[in-house]
Each structure stands twice: as structure tokens, then as C-alpha cells.
Amino acid sequence: EFLYISRQNLPSEEEQFEIYRQIAERMAPAPVTIRTFDLGGDKLAPFGLGEPEENPYLGNRGLRFSLLHHEIFHTQLRAILRASAFGKLKILFPMIIDAEDFSEARHIFNHCQEELYSQGIAFDSSIPLGAMVEIPSAAIGTDTLAQEADFLSIGTNDLVQYTLAVDRNNENVSRYYIQHHPSVLKLIRMSVQAAQRQKVPLSVCGEMASNPLYVPLLIGLGIRELSINPTAFFTVKAIIRNCDAKLERIISDFDFNTSVREVEQLIYTHLKPYYQI
């Protein structure tokens, strides 16, 4: 999103390509996941592409904005594809509602590939396309979504907000922003099980992934890949190394048709040996 903020004009394909290329080259041979831009139309009003919305979180943002403005989406996808010739890149689509959303995005992506091929421009023809699972409808429909996507990533920050209908930045309702709410955990478990059935890689990003209290819980739910804050790396690594097969049994035996208080009891008693290191 930094490419679009504090600018007077939209970034060109060439500008984006140069930035993505530098990232790909510097990180090679490690893979880099580039999420397509996740700004709302309200943030792009200065470019004449949107207008202030009463509730941007439920408005024209993420992939739905990209699908509405093909020219912007097309430019970004071409830039990423061109940069993929210089390193290992993956593309992640945010704010996916369902598999139909993803299919439409893939169709535009395929068109960009055909364009570059006809122009003789090099790119990685096998670049993976992933979907963010951050809306309850996507979590519930993970089985179908996983048949379309090459990989999945659970975005816990938005998943909590949309599941509990709470703005975590609003002090009046912030107490309802409970990351370990049973309903949130059930959606995560549902997504994990669906991804396992479809044999599609799934990771978790957001605040939960970097929180020592939640790492054992996520591992126990079957998560095997976390996207974390660099400052939490060594702590999270130590916790993961402390996890064992018993942890998964503890979580699998736990009934998430329960209360927040009982989940907290699970975290602060049964899971304590795993994160208190």
C-alpha cells in the first residue's frame, strides 16, 4: 500500500516493477509473497478513483476494488509478473469472499500472462496464486476456495473483526476484540481442516501469529506456517521447538463450543508449559 499513499499520481507499471524486482533479487533464493493492494476506495479518492465511505471496512476495498478497477489491478499484476523473472515470487489476493472472487482474479492474471508472453517479456509462468482467508464466508468456504488457490493465508486481524463485528481501533468496543473467541478459533480450525483435505499450504498472519500466548494454540490447531513480526522471531521459534505431539491432542480434545473464559483456562493452564519458556 505504501506505493499508493502520499502520492499525487498512481504508480506506473515501471515504478512498481523496479520495486518488486529489487525485493525479488535481494531475497533470492527465498520466496517473497506480494499481496495485491488492500486499500479502500476512500484512500484513493485523491486519484479520483473512490470516495469517502461511512464504513470502509465493509466497503469497496481489497480485491473487490481491484476487480472494479481492472486497469490498476492489471498494472500491478504485470509489474509483479515481470519481477518474477528475477526471483521467487508469490501473489496473494486480499479480501476474498469466495472461490468466484478468486476465479475472476485468476482470469485477469492469466490475461496478463498472455500479454507478456505475446510481447516476449520474461516471467515465471508457474508463479503461485494465494487467497487471504479473513472473511467468515471465505473461512466457511475454504474447501471450495482451496480447489482454486495454490496456497492460503489466514489473516487473523480482519477475521476477528469481521467475525465479531468489532473495530479493534474503536475504544468503545475494543473489549469485544477477542482473538481467542471460540467462534474465531472454530473458523480457523475449519480452514485448517479444509486445507489439509485439499492438500493446499496454509499459513497464519496477523497479531495472533506473533503472540506467544497464541502460538501453541495455532500449532495445536494444525498450523505449520506463521508470518510473524521480526521482533518476535526468536521467541516464537523457541515456543515452536517446545511443542510436541501431546499439544495437538490437547487441542483436538478441546470443545470449542464453549465460552471465552474456558478458552482462556485452556491457554493459561494446559498450554502454559509451551509458551512459558
Regions found by a protein language model. Give the residues of each.
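Conserved alpha/beta-domain cores
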Residues: 1-277
